[in-house]
């Protein structure tokens, strides 16, 4: 299998963003899954922050994974990847200066693009887990990310949560990040096409949506017409791998267990112990849901 340079994969991703089509990402979480995704013809993969936390820490998505741990996993994928892949870089692991370090490390790891979100992470004492940083801080992070990259083909995508703010505020944020120079805008929490149309109306950069399979947004042609080029429907491949591992090991031990009929998502919940983290956050941090 011929090797493809990281810069070439980044150009491929930019070419994808320039087309009038919308594609769905493959969830890639290790070198094998990246090779499988490329062999099956996926145009782009994504290393999700939540999936990396599960893979590295067996922990839920509470911003517990460190930059070095995330970069190590991205590097393993980048070493063999035959398709461009996006790194979900969460909040950039700190302030704007931390964002610069994040970009430097992930660029060396071989990612084609990375998302930097404006969620207030990690969760702060006495704050809601969905709180966002100010627009000004978000702009600073976008500008810092652009300054830090060496390869101009690396795409910097600004991410925000469209589900926790009034539509007018979402429009203000996305336009601000576009003006700051982001190569694309990623959104989670878009409710339906009417919501998307309102936000996308004045945006000219390519859009990326995290839909988690929302049936109200299940129309690739319509998404493409509104500027959406990449959709993350979820990380089904990873959860299927967890379920397959459980089923195989259970069969090997010839056991019947109370968790036998649980779905992949339920199994993940069982073994990551999220109730512990929720309780600790409430006890030690007074985090509001």
From Swiss-Prot:
Classification via Gene3D superfamilies: Phosphoenolpyruvate-binding domains (3.20.20.60)
Mind listing the GO biological process terms from this record? oxaloacetate metabolic process; propionate catabolic process, 2-methylcitrate cycle; pyruvate biosynthetic process
Residues that, per the record, bind substrate: 50, 159, 235
CDD domains reported for this sequence = ICL_PEPM
User: Per the record's keyword annotation, is Metal-binding included, yes or no?
Assistant: yes
Q: How is the cofactor bound?
A: Binds 1 Mg(2+) ion per subunit.
Swiss-Prot/TrEMBL cofactor(s): Mg(2+)
Leading EC class: lyase
Report the Pfam families cross-referenced here.
Answer: PEP_mutase (PF13714)
The organism's superkingdom is given as Bacteria
Q: Name one GO molecular function term.
A: methylisocitrate lyase activity
Q: Entry's InterPro entries? A: ICL/PEPM (IPR039556), Oxaloacetate_deCOase_bac (IPR023687), Pyrv/PenolPyrv_kinase-like_dom (IPR015813), Pyrv_kinase-like_dom_sf (IPR040442)
Catalysed reaction equations from the record: oxaloacetate + H(+) = pyruvate + CO2
Identify the EC number(s).
4.1.1.112
For this UniProt record, the keywords arranged alphabetically read as follows: Decarboxylase, Lyase, Magnesium, Metal-binding
Residues the entry annotates as binding Mg(2+): 88
Q: Which family does it belong to?
A: Belongs to the isocitrate lyase family. Oxaloacetate decarboxylase subfamily.
What's this protein's function? Catalyzes the decarboxylation of oxaloacetate into pyruvate. Seems to play a role in maintaining cellular concentrations of bicarbonate and pyruvate.
Q: How does it assemble?
A: Homotetramer; dimer of dimers.
Q: What is this protein called?
A: Oxaloacetate decarboxylase
Species of origin reads Pseudomonas fluorescens (strain SBW25)
């Amino acid at each position: 299998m011929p090797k493809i340079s990281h810069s070439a994969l980044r150009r491929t991703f930019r070419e994808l963003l320039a087309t009038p089509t919308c594609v769905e990402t493959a969830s890639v979480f290790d070198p094998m899954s990246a090779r499988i995704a490329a062999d099956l013809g996926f145009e782009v993969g994504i290393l999700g922050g939540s999936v990396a936390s599960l893979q590295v820490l067996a922990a839920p998505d509470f911003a517990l994974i460190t930059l070095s741990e995330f970069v190590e996993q991205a590097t393993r994928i980048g070493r063999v990847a035959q398709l461009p892949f996006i790194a979900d870089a969460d909040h950039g692991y700190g302030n704007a200066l931390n964002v610069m370090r994040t970009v430097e490390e992930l660029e060396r790891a071989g990612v084609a693009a990375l998302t930097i979100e404006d969620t207030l992470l990690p969760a702060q004492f006495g704050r809601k887990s969905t709180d966002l940083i100010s627009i000004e801080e978000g702009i600073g992070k976008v500008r810092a990310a652009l300054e830090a990259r060496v390869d101009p083909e690396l795409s910097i995508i600004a991410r925000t949560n469209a589900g926790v703010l009034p539509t007018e505020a979402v429009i203000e944020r996305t336009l601000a990040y576009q003006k700051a120079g982001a190569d694309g805008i990623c959104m989670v929490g878009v409710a339906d096409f009417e919501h998307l149309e309102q936000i996308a109306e004045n945006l000219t950069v390519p859009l990326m949506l995290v839909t988690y399979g929302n049936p109200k947004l299940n129309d690739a042609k319509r998404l493409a017409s509104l500027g959406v080029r990449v959709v993350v429907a979820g990380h089904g491949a990873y959860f299927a791998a967890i379920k397959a591992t459980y089923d195989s090991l259970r069969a090997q031990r010839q056991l019947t267990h109370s968790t036998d009929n649980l779905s992949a998502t339920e199994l993940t919940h069982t073994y990551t112990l999220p109730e512990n983290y929720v309780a600790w956050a409430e006890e030690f941090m007074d985090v509001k849901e």
